[in-house]
Structure formats: structure tokens, C-alpha cells
Regions:
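Polar-ligand-bearing catalytic/cofactor-coordination segments
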Residues: 1-146, 156, 160-221
């Protein structure tokens, strides 16, 4: 568990500048007027970025996306070309203001902290449960000790069940962050109408269910 902390932080730091460009075609956004408007919003949100990047995704998907990624000086503002092609300027600015809300609220650091804490207790519980199961049923399961490779299927079974069971907690935290980011965007761009039309367009392009059943919402949204 301790080993995952520096590794996760390292990849979060290098992801925007090294990992993401390996798999996608990044370039500076062509619409410089729009870029200046986005950077003006970024300045209000104290985001240390001086460029906006466009990613070519139209050949791969019809979905739209935009995000602010990275930590510290490696922070980047990114828009998919599908977003630029299918949303109006007001809608694009709302999307970016929403993503900047996550940055302003330091959600990436909160998410990392929450993930580390939850994973610590989950893995601790898994270790305790596996030891108990192996002590009582190790002969039947053909597992002599927890370190044995034969214990891997048992670990995968238990961990998948546990992480699924606690997923409503993760989605609840995510929904809370999304609501705060929405409110931040409304205050930043002062345009609620753009927010409504943006969500409708995103739901349509990303094939999201507008009103999922409550149980689905708890586990997936």
C-alpha cells in the first residue's frame, strides 16, 4: 500500500506531459480568440497554464470531453476536437469553467487522499479476511498461506466484491464534487443557460442516461 503512494503521485505529475501525448495527438488550439477567453478564466481560477491544447479524437469517438490535468507546473488545459466541433463558444467556456472548478476546489488532491485512505482500510480488511478463510478452509481451497500464488483468485474475488460494495460512497463523493464544480462554473461565466444546453449535448453525445434508476445512480453516477 505504501509503495502505491509515490507511484500514484509520480504518474499524476507526468501524465499530462509524457503519458497522454503518447496515445493521442496534442496540438495548440487553432481558435486563438477562444484560447484567450479560456486562459482568462484560468487566471481567475489561479491555474498556472499559458496554452490550451486540442486533442484529435474525432476519428475514435463521437463523445466530447474537456479537462484540466496535472499537478503544479505540469497543469494543462485540454479540449477534444469533438467538443470544439459540437458545442457553442458559450458552452465550451462553461465546460472549461466546470473543469476549472475541480482544480480550484483541489479535487485531484482530495480524490488521491480519499483513495489512499479507503484503499488502506480495504486492503487491511482483505488481508484479515483472507487469513481467516485460509486458516479455516485452506485445505479445501488448496491454499496453504496468504502469500501463495494460489491465493490470487481468492484475493481478486474478495477485492472485487468489496470495491463494488463501497462504490456508492465513491459516487456520492463524486456527485458532491460535480455539483460544486457546476456552481463554480455558473458563478464564473454567469450563464446558467449555457450549462443546461451543455449537459444536454454531453449526455446525447456520450450516450448517458438522463434519468437512471436510483440504484443505478448510487452505483454508477
Amino acid at each position: 500500500w505504501l509503495v502505491t503512494i509515490p507511484i500514484t503521485l509520480f504518474f499524476a505529475y507526468i501524465q499530462p506531459v509524457i503519458i497522454e501525448p503518447l496515445f493521442n495527438d496534442f496540438s495548440s488550439i487553432e481558435n486563438k480568440e477562444l484560447e484567450q477567453k479560456i486562459l482568462a478564466l484560468a487566471e481567475e481560477a489561479d491555474i498556472p497554464a499559458n496554452r490550451v491544447y486540442e486533442v484529435k479524437m474525432a476519428d475514435q469517438t463521437n463523445a466530447m470531453n474537456a479537462y484540466v490535468s496535472g499537478i503544479g507546473k505540469n497543469t494543462q488545459i485540454v479540449l477534444w476536437d469533438t467538443t470544439l466541433a459540437n458545442l457553442s463558444e458559450e458552452e465550451i467556456l462553461f465546460v472549461m469553467a466546470h473543469e476549472m472548478g475541480h482544480y480550484a476546489h483541489k479535487d485531484i488532491y482530495k480524490d488521491l487522499t480519499i483513495d489512499f485512505v479507503i484503499s488502506f482500510f480495504v486492503y487491511w480488511f482483505i488481508a484479515k479476511l483472507m487469513k481467516n478463510i485460509i486458516q479455516k478452509n485452506g485445505q479445501v481451497l488448496n491454499i496453504k498461506r496468504i502469500e501463495a500464488i494460489h491465493s490470487l483468485p481468492l484475493y481478486l474475488l474478495i477485492s472485487s466484491i468489496l470495491f463494488f460494495a463501497i462504490s456508492p460512497l465513491s459516487t456520492a463523493i463524486s456527485r458532491h464534487q460535480e455539483i460544486k464544480a457546476d456552481n463554480y462554473a455558473i458563478e464564473l461565466v454567469e450563464e446558467e443557460g449555457a450549462g443546461i444546453s451543455t449537459f444536454q449535448a454531453l449526455a446525447k453525445s456520450n450516450l448517458n442516461e438522463a434519468n437512471p434508476p436510483l440504484i443505478v445512480k448510487w452505483f454508477r453516477y
